């Protein structure tokens, strides 16, 4: 099994150098991505500092991946930003295997793009067309439409779908997953060893996917469901999701670290008691109107009922913070004492997970994992693979090597006494409209890659909703206003320049968000400081009305 992972790592290194066409808002940046931490960085330029990402029905996004080339034509392509006409979609998928395919692809660009915005350095339109001279034979470009390129993978949807799959489906796809790597690297393995690996992973995936139920409707029926689960010795958790980011609150809360069964039983006596209980616990959220009228929201929008697992919290993600700082991470990342997870210099881009050989050796010992959380850590990639297959993001393992995740985080719990495992939260976004670290790179350029800035400086990216989408749409209707908006917030942020830096803005279906980051080494990370910053930005939005 160790050999398998060695090959796995080697394969990751081989396929890591990609030329990516990456969408930011209605602009597509073409650039060489070199995430090989052992190689000298070839990124000698800064990314275009465009930060307003907008997702709407009349705009599309496209993700293109092309095998690496150091040709002059590709160097030109890296510097280009294309802006395309609203309402146009690329065919999906679009493969370039020969020059005819390339001509078709360039015609698509010609027909869909009304301008080519030139940045640094300024190449002409004619120079862009020299891409036609490049021999694309045996190269492949995969273009994803906006539906998949912006797809949110959430615990209440994608995980549940995988859980509902039967064991045969899970086993078959895990077999395909391992067979791909074995054949690609000409690795021989006994049937017994192969079956052992597959059996372990199938069992693991089935164990971490806690069955959850989405309930929408009458509160009294919800009360009866919870009461019934208690009678079957299943301790329920109500999880209320009210944002695209997967933000959720679990109730009932533990008291002194214990699940208070008597309290729950007492509030389940009748409909009125239960409604009062729900209202009281959610109303305790100060300065947060997400949970107002909670009873009506459950009836209209629904709530998730999960099995309760008493145990320690663990989380998986690109960041590796000290435990002292973990409370400030929206995904609650904790330090698992894993050797550098962030091995390739970026936080929200790259392969889904990074492993080092020493770490893998510490996990694997005669195919037996030393700790449950370490076993979890490895299995997440297989789980993401199953989700991508089931959601139609990829068709086979060969495409999985090109899948990246943005805003990736997983939280699970382990019952130390019983060994019970449960996946609480998984939040991930396939390559999408907004990559926060691009803006960091535009500020720091090559240093961002060479010094592993996010890891060494412990930068945290965070978002805060500052205005409803309807209100924002009334304020800004054109690109000129958009530029003013960016300039406005860039100036506003200066008063916090010693601790905070603006990363990007993002518009999603339920609001207008501002992304920012701050330095652990500069800011004392007192929660009050962060809260003041967010309140400041929320108040500042009111001034936008005067921009017109």
What do these predicted ranges mean?
Residues 2-41, 82, 116-119:
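N-terminal leader/transition segments
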Residues 40-55, 65-233, 242-244, 251, ...:
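Conserved N-proximal alpha/beta basic substrate-recognition cap immediately N-terminal to
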Residues 179-302, 357-382:
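Active-site nucleotide/adenylate-binding loops and adjacent lid/helix of ATP-dependent enzymes
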Residues 233, 253-254, 269-342, 409, ...:
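Phosphate-binding site of ATP-dependent enzymes
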Residues 242-244, 308-312, 401-406, 510-511:
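A short catalytic or substrate-binding loop motif that flags glycine-/basic-rich loops and adjacent residues
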Residues 265, 318-393, 427-463:
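ATP-dependent carboxylate/phosphate-activation module, predominantly the ATP-grasp catalytic core
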Residues 392-410, 453-457, 544-547:
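Flexible, glycine/charged-enriched surface loops at secondary-structure junctions
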Residues 445-548:
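Peripheral (often C-terminal) accessory segments that flank ATP-dependent C-N-forming ligase machineries
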């Amino acid at each position: 099994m160790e050999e398998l992972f060695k090959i796995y790592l080697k394969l990751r290194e081989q396929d890591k150098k990609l030329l990516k066409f990456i969408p930011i808002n209605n602009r597509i940046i073409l650039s060489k991505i070199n995430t090989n931490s052992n190689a000298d960085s070839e990124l000698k330029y800064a990314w275009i500092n465009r930060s307003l990402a907008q997702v709407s029905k009349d705009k599309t996004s496209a993700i293109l991946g092309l095998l690496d080339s150091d040709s002059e034509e590709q160097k030109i392509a890296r510097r280009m930003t294309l802006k395309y006409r609203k309402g146009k979609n690329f065919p999906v998928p679009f493969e370039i295997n020969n020059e005819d395919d390339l001509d078709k692809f360039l015609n698509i660009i010609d027909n869909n793009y009304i301008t080519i915005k030139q940045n640094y350095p300024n190449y002409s339109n004619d120079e862009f067309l020299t891409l036609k001279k490049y021999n694309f034979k045996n190269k492949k470009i995969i273009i994803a439409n906006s539906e998949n390129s912006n797809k949110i993978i959430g615990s209440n949807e994608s995980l549940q779908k995988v859980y509902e799959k039967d064991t045969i489906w899970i086993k078959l796809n895990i077999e395909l997953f391992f067979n791909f790597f074995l054949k690609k690297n000409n690795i021989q393995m006994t049937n017994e060893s192969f079956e052992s690996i597959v059996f372990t992973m199938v069992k693991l995936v089935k164990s971490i996917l806690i069955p959850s139920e989405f309930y929408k409707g009458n509160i009294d029926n919800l009360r009866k469901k919870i009461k019934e689960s208690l009678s079957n010795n299943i301790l329920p958790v109500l999880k209320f999701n009210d944002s695209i980011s997967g933000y959720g609150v679990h109730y009932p809360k533990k008291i002194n670290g214990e699940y208070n069964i008597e309290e729950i039983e007492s509030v389940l006596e009748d409909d009125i008691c239960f409604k009062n209980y729900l209202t009281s616990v959610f109303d305790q959220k100060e300065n947060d109107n997400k949970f107002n009228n909670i009873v009506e929201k459950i009836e209209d929008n629904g709530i998730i009922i999960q099995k309760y697992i008493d145990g320690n919290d663990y989380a998986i993600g690109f960041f590796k913070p000290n435990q002292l700082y973990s409370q400030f991470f929206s995904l609650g990342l904790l330090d698992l004492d894993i050797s550098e997870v962030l091995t390739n210099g970026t936080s929200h881009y790259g392969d889904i997970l990074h492993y080092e050989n020493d770490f893998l050796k510490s996990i694997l010992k005669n195919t037996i994992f030393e700790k449950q959380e370490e076993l979890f850590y490895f299995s997440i990639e297989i789980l993401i693979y199953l989700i991508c297959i089931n959601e139609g993001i990829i068709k086979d393992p060969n495409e999985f090597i090109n899948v990246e995740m943005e805003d990736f985080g997983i939280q699970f719990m382990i019952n130390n006494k019983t060994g019970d495992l449960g996946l609480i939260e998984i939040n991930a976004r396939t390559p999408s409209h907004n990559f926060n670290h691009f803006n960091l790179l535009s500020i720091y350029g090559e240093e961002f890659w060479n010094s592993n800035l996010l890891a060494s400086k412990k930068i945290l990216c965070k978002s805060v909703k500052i205005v409803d989408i309807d209100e924002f749409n009334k304020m800004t209707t054109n690109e000129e206003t958009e530029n003013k908006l960016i300039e406005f917030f860039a100036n506003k942020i200066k008063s916090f320049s010693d601790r905070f830096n603006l990363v990007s803005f993002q518009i999603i279906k339920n609001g207008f968000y501002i992304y920012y980051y701050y330095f652990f080494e500069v800011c004392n990370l007192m929660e009050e400081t962060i809260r003041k910053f967010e309140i400041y930005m929320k108040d500042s939005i009111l001034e936008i009305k005067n921009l017109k």
